[in-house]
C-alpha cells in the first residue's frame, strides 16, 4: 500500500481535482492512518478501528473523482460501488455482502500482478525458450537455437508469425448463477470449472500471433506457473481485511425520505444490511471468510432531497468524519478549465491536433466559458463541473464538425466566439433547459 504522507497525497490529488481541500485532507489522513496502523504492535493494531468518512456535497464538485484518483494512489484493494445497486436481502438484486467479495477479487488481481513482477525475469527466459520452440522446433540443435536467439534478441524476428499454446483462462460457462439464500451466490459454478480445469491439467488454446506480441501472453503464462495460487489468495484476503477501502457512492439515495411504506422500506433495508458490514462482520467468500472490522468505508452523497440525518442513526454513528464539499464558483470553473493535468481545454486541443488543426483559447474566452457555466448552473440545474463539458461541446460543435476539412488552420476562440455560440441559449432559460 502507499507510503505517501498526507501532504503528498493531497498534492497528488491537486493535480487532477480543483479545490475541495477539506475533503482531500480527510481522505489523505484516512489513507495515511492505514499505514500508521500497520506499524503498531499486533495487540494494539487489532483495537485501532478505521474512522469512516461521509462526504456531503452537490453533484459535480469532485466526490467521485476524489475516489477514482484515490484508488490509483492507494496501492491497496479499493472498490467503488453505487449504494443504489443493492437491495435488501430476500429481494431480487445484489446483496451488500457482494461488495466484500468484489473487494477480495480486486485484492487477488493486485497481489497476482505483484507476484508476477517478482518472477518476471525467470518467466521471460522461459517465454523466450517457448518462442524458439515455435520458431525452430524443440529438437533443433543448440547452434541453430543460439543463432535464432541472437536474431530474436536483436528484434529481427519481431514481425514473424508463430503458433503458441497458452492457458485458456476464459471459462466455458457463464459467470455463475444467483442462488437465493446462498452466500457467495456464484461460487458453485466457478469452483466446478476450476476443479475440472485442474483435473484435466488445465485447458490450453492455440493462438496465432507475431513474435513481438507473443511475449506478453507467454510471460504471463510462465509467471502463473511460477506463483503459488493459494499464497496469493491468503495474501489477498489479508490485504482486503487490513488495507481494503470501499467507496459507497450515492448513499443519499438509500436514505429514508418519508415514513411511508413501499420502496422506502427496501431502502431502509439496504441501510440495515450495510450496518454489520461497516461495523465489522465476517463475510464468506470462495477464498475463505473475510473480516470487515478494519476495512475503511468512505460514503458520499449529494443529499439534495434527503439529509444526512435521514440515514439510520446507527449508520450515522458509523460514519464519524463528516466532510462538506462546497459548490463551485466562477474562479473554480476557470481553474478546472486550465489547471488539471488533463483539463478540458488541453483535451480538446489534443483532439483537434489529430486533425492538424491548432486551437487557441484566449483568457477572456475562458472567463466567458466559466460565466456561462455558472449562469446555467444557477438558473437551470446545478450539475457542477459537468456543465463545462456541455458548454464546451456546444461552443466547439462547428469546429469539430469541420475539423477534417481545415487541416493546417489555426483557430483562436475568444469571448465573442463563445457568446456567439452559447450566449442566446444561456440567456433564454426555457431553451437552455432542453439544450444545455
Curated annotation (Swiss-Prot):
Q: What is its main location?
A: cytoplasm
Question: What would be one Gene Ontology cellular-component term for the protein?
Answer: HslUV protease complex
The UniProt record gives the binding positions of ATP as 18, 60-65, 249, 314, 386
Q: Does the keyword Chaperone apply?
A: yes
Subcellular locations according to the entry: Cytoplasm
What SMART domains does this protein's entry cite?
AAA, ClpB_D2-small
Q: Which domain of life is it from?
A: Bacteria
Tell me one GO biological process term: proteolysis involved in protein catabolic process
Molecular-function GO terms, alphabetical: ATP binding; ATP hydrolysis activity; peptidase activity; proteasome-activating activity
Question: Per UniProt, which keywords does this protein have?
Answer: ATP-binding, Chaperone, Cytoplasm, Nucleotide-binding, Stress response
Is-annotated flag, keyword ATP-binding?
A: yes
Hey, which family's this protein in?
Belongs to the ClpX chaperone family. HslU subfamily.
PANTHER family from the UniProt entry: ATP-DEPENDENT CLP PROTEASE ATP-BINDING SUBUNIT CLPX-LIKE, MITOCHONDRIAL-RELATED, ATP-DEPENDENT PROTEASE ATPASE SUBUNIT HSLU
- What this chain does, per the record? ATPase subunit of a proteasome-like degradation complex; this subunit has chaperone activity. The binding of ATP and its subsequent hydrolysis by HslU are essential for unfolding of protein substrates subsequently hydrolyzed by HslV. HslU recognizes the N-terminal part of its protein substrates and unfolds these before they are guided to HslV for hydrolysis.
Record note on quaternary structure: A double ring-shaped homohexamer of HslV is capped on each side by a ring-shaped HslU homohexamer. The assembly of the HslU/HslV complex is dependent on binding of ATP.
Q: What is this protein called?
A: ATP-dependent protease ATPase subunit HslU
Lineage runs:
Bacteria, Pseudomonadati, Pseudomonadota, Alphaproteobacteria, Hyphomicrobiales
Amino acid at each position: 500500500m502507499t507510503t505517501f504522507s498526507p501532504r503528498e497525497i493531497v498534492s497528488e490529488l491537486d493535480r487532477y481535482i480543483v479545490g475541495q481541500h477539506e475533503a482531500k485532507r480527510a481522505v489523505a489522513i484516512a489513507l495515511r492512518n492505514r499505514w500508521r496502523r500497520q506499524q503498531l504492535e499486533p495487540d494494539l493494531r487489532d483495537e485501532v478501528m478505521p474512522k469512516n468518512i461521509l462526504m456531503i456535497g452537490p453533484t459535480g464538485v469532485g466526490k467521485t473523482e476524489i475516489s477514482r484518483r484515490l484508488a490509483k494512489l492507494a496501492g491497496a484493494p479499493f472498490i467503488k460501488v453505487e449504494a443504489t445497486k443493492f437491495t435488501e436481502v430476500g429481494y431480487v438484486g445484489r446483496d451488500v455482502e457482494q461488495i466484500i467479495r468484489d473487494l477480495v477479487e480486486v485484492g487477488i488481481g493486485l497481489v497476482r500482478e505483484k507476484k508476477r513482477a517478482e518472477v518476471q525475469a525467470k518467466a521471460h527466459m522461459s517465454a523466450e525458450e517457448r518462442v524458439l520452440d515455435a520458431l525452430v522446433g524443440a529438437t533443433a540443435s543448440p547452434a541453430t537455437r543460439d543463432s535464432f536467439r541472437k536474431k530474436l534478441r536483436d528484434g529481427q524476428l519481431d514481425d514473424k508469425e508463430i503458433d503458441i499454446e497458452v492457458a485458456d483462462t476464459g471459462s466455458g460457462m457463464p459467470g455463475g448463477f444467483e442462488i437465493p439464500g446462498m452466500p457467495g451466490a456464484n461460487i458453485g459454478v466457478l469452483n466446478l470449472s476450476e476443479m475440472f480445469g485442474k483435473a484435466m491439467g488445465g485447458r490450453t488454446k492455440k493462438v496465432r500471433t507475431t513474435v513481438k506480441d507473443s511475449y506478453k501472453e507467454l510471460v504471463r503464462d510462465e509467471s502463473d506457473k511460477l506463483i503459488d495460487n493459494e499464497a496469493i489468495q491468503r495474501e489477498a484476503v489479508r490485504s482486503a481485511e487490513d488495507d481494503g477501502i470501499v467507496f459507497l457512492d450515492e448513499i443519499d439515495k438509500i436514505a429514508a425520505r418519508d415514513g411511508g411504506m413501499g420502496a422506502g422500506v427496501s431502502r431502509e433495508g439496504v441501510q440495515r444490511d450495510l450496518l454489520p458490514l461497516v461495523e465489522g462482520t465476517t463475510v464468506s467468500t470462495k477464498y475463505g471468510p473475510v473480516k470487515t472490522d478494519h476495512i475503511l468505508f468512505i460514503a458520499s452523497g449529494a443529499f439534495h432531497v434527503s439529509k444526512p440525518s435521514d440515514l439510520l442513526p446507527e449508520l450515522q454513528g458509523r460514519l464519524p468524519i463528516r466532510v462538506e464539499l462546497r459548490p463551485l464558483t466562477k474562479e473554480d470553473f476557470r481553474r478546472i478549465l486550465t489547471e488539471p493535468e488533463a483539463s478540458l481545454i488541453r483535451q480538446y486541443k489534443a483532439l483537434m491536433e489529430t486533425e492538424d488543426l491548432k486551437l487557441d483559447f484566449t483568457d477572456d474566452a475562458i472567463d466567458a466559458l466559466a460565466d456561462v457555466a455558472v449562469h446555467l448552473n444557477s438558473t437551470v440545474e446545478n450539475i457542477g463541473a459537468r456543465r463545462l463539458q456541455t458548454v464546451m461541446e456546444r461552443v466547439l460543435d462547428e469546429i469539430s464538425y469541420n475539423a477534417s476539412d481545415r487541416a493546417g488552420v489555426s483557430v483562436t476562440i475568444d469571448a465573442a466566439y463563445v457568446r456567439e455560440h452559447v450566449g442566446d441559449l444561456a440567456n433564454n432559460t426555457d431553451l437552455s433547459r432542453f439544450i444545455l
